[in-house]
A protein has these predicted regions:
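Conserved acidic donor-binding segment of nucleotide-sugar-dependent glycosyltransferases
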Residues: 321, 325-332, 341-347
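Short hydrophobic beta-strand element within catalytic cores of glycosyltransferases
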Residues: 306-309
Length: 387
């Protein structure tokens, strides 16, 4: 079978990549894993002409190729307004790939994923939708539409997966919508990263947060908590990893609180550097307001790091076994207290680290691939001719 993946994920040319393209984040890992389920896989994605980017990774996989689209211009309303002209230019490619596909995968949110999803429905193609946002919270009309669509069409040859996890199914109205976790860690990486931690020296507390530098992730609260943490741990530091529109304002916030020398902004780094920074840290702080299934939290757990986070989405399930602490109210004072509670008791810290490793071991990329493969085979039959 041929899989066609329609995604908004921006890719770019790479002379060192077997497919000729690279991208960043967890996308290349997950596409490589999905390609192992099919005879051929085509990624239908926007491509930039810029070849020099930080944190890029080659797109590779079993008989994996890329069909480039032009990159939609603008953001927000401007992007929506320009999308009609983008469609006119890219419709021949979109329709050609839909017609030749045996199964269509649409990761959403995202406008290109949505277009692929609707075209697959129009051409009566088996559809595999993976919702990567917060399934429980719909703030926009698009989010309400995606949820309605998945509940309406989850049955038969259509596989609908919501990224996250809970004891109950995503919806009581349609049991065919199922949970799926998200990861970019291979089993060998989980083994390589696995190291039970001991509490750091009494005055040290190396905190880290890895995420997009945007509002809603709680980065400003972590920065504001650091002066309070330093009262108990005078040598405390904070590593902030990731890029985004709020990066400059967060840097200014560190200056305002007179802790710029204690905060290191790494920007966007590659996967290996993220894991290295996590291995060098003592505690992962992630007071986010909304999530699907945060891969960075899983990576922290895989490195044996206890996690301080919020009661949002799947996070209570990941942390509730004792691999960290959940804060009810996100304030600098609450975060500083949670940091103290994690680091002040050597036995508790050691236990949290052990629990973190146990939790992470359940979420390998191989298990993610096999879970999806089982669901697709149950809906559509054999996926590979050599199966």
């Amino acid at each position: 079978m041929k899989l066609a993946v329609f995604s908004y994920k921006l890719c770019w040319p790479s002379v060192s990549s077997p497919t000729g393209y690279a991208t960043d984040g967890g996308f290349p890992f997950q596409m490589h894993a999905l390609s192992e389920l099919f005879d051929t896989t085509t990624l239908v994605v926007p491509c930039s002409s810029t070849t020099t980017r930080v944190g890029g990774m080659s797109l590779t996989g079993r008989n994996l190729s890329l069909r480039p689209l032009t990159n939609p211009v603008g953001n927000g309303l401007w992007r929506k307004a320009a999308l009609l002209f983008w469609l006119v230019r890219n419709t021949p490619v979109l329709i050609s790939e839909i017609r030749h596909a045996d199964i269509v995968h649409a990761p959403i949110p995202g406008d290109i994923g949505t277009i692929g999803m609707l075209l697959a429905l129009l051409w009566r193609k088996p559809l595999f939708v993976r919702y990567c946002g917060n399934w429980f919270v719909q703030r926009t009309s698009a989010e309400h539409f995606w949820r309605w669509f998945m509940l309406r069409f989850a049955a038969g040859r259509n596989v609908m997966l919501a990224t996250g996890g809970a004891d109950e199914q995503p919806s009581p109205h349609n049991p065919n919508v199922r949970w799926i976790f998200s990861t970019s860690l291979l089993e060998q990486e989980l083994t390589a990263c696995s190291r039970r931690r001991e509490r750091p020296a009494s005055e040290r507390a190396r905190l880290i947060i890895v995420c997009r530098q945007e509002k809603g992730k709680g980065i400003e609260k972590v920065i504001e908590s650091l002066p309070l943490v330093m009262k108990s741990f005078p040598n405390a530091t904070l590593d902030i990893v990731g890029d985004g529109t709020e990066l400059t304002s967060f840097k200014q916030l560190a200056i305002t609180h007179k802790i710029a020398s204690r905060v290191t902004f790494h920007g966007k780094v590659d996967h290996e550097k993220v894991l290295l920074l996590l291995q060098q840290s003592d505690l992962f702080c992630y007071p986010t307001a909304s999530e699907g299934f945060p891969k960075a939290v899983l990576e922290a757990l895989a490195c044996g790091l206890p996690v301080v986070t919020t009661c949002v989405s799947v996070l209570p399930k990941l942390i509730g076994n004792g691999s960290g602490l959940l804060v009810e109210k996100v304030t600098p004072e609450a975060l500083a207290q949670a940091v103290f509670d994690c680091l002040s008791d050597a036995e508790r810290y050691r236990s949290m680290s052990t629990r973190a490793l146990e939790t992470a071991s359940q979420y390998s990329l191989e298990r993610w691939r096999d879970t999806i493969g089982d669901l697709l085979r149950a809906a559509c039959g054999p996926l590979r001719s050599d199966a």
